[in-house]
Amino acid sequence: MFRCGGLAGAFKQKLVPLVRSVCVQRPKQRNRLPGNLFQQWRVPLELQMARQMASSGPSGGKMDNSVLVLIVGLSTIGAGAYAYKTIKEDQKRYNERIMGLGLSPEEKQRRAIASAAEGGSVPPIRVPSHVPFLLIGGGTAAFAAARSIRARDPGARVLIVSEDPELPYMRPPLSKELWFSDDPNVTKTLQFRQWNGKERSIYFQPPSFYVSAQDLPHIENGGVAVLTGKKVVHLDVRGNMVKLNDGSQITFEKCLIATGGTPRSLSAIDRAGAEVKSRTTLFRKIGDFRALEKISREVKSITVIGGGFLGSELACALGRKSQASGIEVIQLFPEKGNMGKILPEYLSNWTMEKVKREGVKVMPNAIVQSVGVSGGKLLIKLKDGRKVETDHIVTAVGLEPNVELAKTGGLEIDSDFGGFRVNAELQARSNIWVAGDAACFYDIKLGRRRVEHHDHAVVSGRLAGENMTGAAKPYWHQSMFWSDLGPDVGYEAIGLVDSSLPTVGVFAKATAQDNPKSATEQSGTGIRSESETESEASEITIPPSDPAVPQVPVEGEDYGKGVIFYLRDKVVVGIVLWNVFNRMPIARKIIKDGEQHEDLNEVAKLFNIHED
């Protein structure tokens, strides 16, 4: 006899409940009376009664033939209607289950939500009452921690509770690659083509990677489950328990807080009316990307407020798009130039000119005083008297760390940097860790810090996961961050990069290979932190040389590629690699060593910027 496996087994399991006993097996008791045949065939009670009435009249006499015919006819019609209804219902359930076999968990969830919107009901998700590892937040840090926990403990059961309706995904492409896609369905697929031509999804893993939350406690080899659209509203540190916004309670053994941050708004917008707020995007999530992409096809002008990484990336992306659509893109910020808080002034000004060439009207030294509505347009009034009319506003002015759980959990908030205050091992309590944007940690090289970048989320999440499984390691691996202003200009940075610090820049003429596009082609990934290898810079030697006065870059030069060193007490504490790629391990080693250097021109040679 053949055995059905794989898909056949799935079909069998799905369709077994639909099988009906339309044929009666031979009874084991041969002396059973035939009068039970109707019960065996599951004929409705009213039809059985009709049959009995048809076989005998009052007081056991024979019925009139016309009455008999009427009863038999009605019985036949009723039986036919019943059979028709039964077959149609079975066919409907059959089709639904056949279609359900090929649906992903994401699609099933989407259809369930759509059914609820149309008046249907969504079965409640069973929340496990206890998990060994609980991760609060569904971003990069939480996912990195989950992978790290499972790597050290392959049987671990990990539950991620995420307020976001999406499965864990990477944020950088939301302001970079997705905007350069020529796929008209990019907002649905969320697939992007990297500069090297390879396709990639912004999701870290497909739905099949995860297990269901209700099955998590019973799976023999453990796994990672995600509760989407759920928020932890109460944390009991002593009782190892959290409460969700739906009233559910979960106890845990180890807990990670990776709640990230919320985009900051402007007080001028907060004071404005409802119409201004409805025409303002606080850019952060997938939903914000989808909304802004749609808006960019419908309006005539968009103003980006903010001159940092996110604001400049979005301005460049929208500016490049405007070359085909004709939309006006304006960027305004209080600094003198783009990324003025990070880059030295000469490089910030050069970057601003680059952004202008992308089709953006850049307005530096702009402080927003008020926002209102005038003639169907949003009217932005600046402190110096200038006015800007626009159809839509995008604010990119930083994050406010999500620290609401500090109150119920009795956790400390850092008064200088914000975020949960943790030690070098990212611990807030003996069984509580914090990672990502919400963590204010002690860097054993650079002091107390709070960092809001993708690679830091990866590094801190991974470290927290290791320490949750007993590693007891301090935060020593310096995370990096990067920013691309289109395919031609990009930079990578590490450490303390603050334009208020003394800087030394060493530059060289760029070649056709010195751009983000070429870097991606060589590394195979647009998420450049993924291409790093520490072993490349395990040993570096800086040759001795006579002290030299570093050359000060001249305003107006073409800064094709170079290295900018940030100094504190003559020690390099931060490095920006300008159109220099795949050299981050060297920069990390220099900062880790923490030595004074007499001639930074010699140090710059380690990055091979003068090679053709």
Swiss-Prot record:
Motif Nuclear localization signal per UniProt: ranges: 445-450
Keyword terms: Acetylation, Apoptosis, Cytoplasm, DNA-binding, FAD, Flavoprotein, Isopeptide bond, Membrane, Mitochondrion, Mitochondrion inner membrane, NAD, Nucleus, Oxidoreductase, Phosphoprotein, Transit peptide, Ubl conjugation
Location in or out of the cell: Mitochondrion intermembrane space; Mitochondrion inner membrane; Cytoplasm; Nucleus
Residues that, per the record, bind NAD(+) 2: W195, E492, N582
Numbered residues of crosslink Glycyl lysine isopeptide (Lys-Gly) (interchain with G-Cter in ubiquitin): K254
Residues recorded as bearing Phosphoserine in the entry: S115, S267, S370, S523, S529
N6-succinyllysine sites (modified residues): K108
Ranges of biased composition (kind: Polar residues): 512-528
Transit peptide interval: 1-53
Residues noted as binding FAD in the record, renumbered to the chain: 137-141, 163-164, 171, 176, 232, 284, 437, 453-454, 482
A GO BP entry: cellular response to hydrogen peroxide
Cofactor: FAD
One Gene Ontology MF term: FAD binding
EC number: 1.6.99.-
Motif annotated as Mitochondrial localization signal, chain positions: 1-30, 62-88
Record-linked Gene3D superfamilies: 3.30.390.30, FAD/NAD(P)-binding domain (3.50.50.60)
Reactions catalysed, as given in the entry: A + NADH + H(+) = AH2 + NAD(+)
InterPro entries noted in UniProt: AIF_C, FAD-oxidoreductase/Apoptosis, FAD/NAD-bd_sf, FAD/NAD-binding_dom, FAD/NAD-linked_Rdtase_dimer_sf
The protein's role, per its UniProt record: Functions both as NADH oxidoreductase and as regulator of apoptosis. In response to apoptotic stimuli, it is released from the mitochondrion intermembrane space into the cytosol and to the nucleus, where it functions as a proapoptotic factor in a caspase-independent pathway. Release into the cytoplasm is mediated upon binding to poly-ADP-ribose chains. The soluble form (AIFsol) found in the nucleus induces 'parthanatos' i.e. caspase-independent fragmentation of chromosomal DNA. Binds to DNA in a sequence-independent manner.
Family from the record: Belongs to the FAD-dependent oxidoreductase family.
The protein's name in its UniProt record: Apoptosis-inducing factor 1, mitochondrial
Annotated source species: Rattus norvegicus
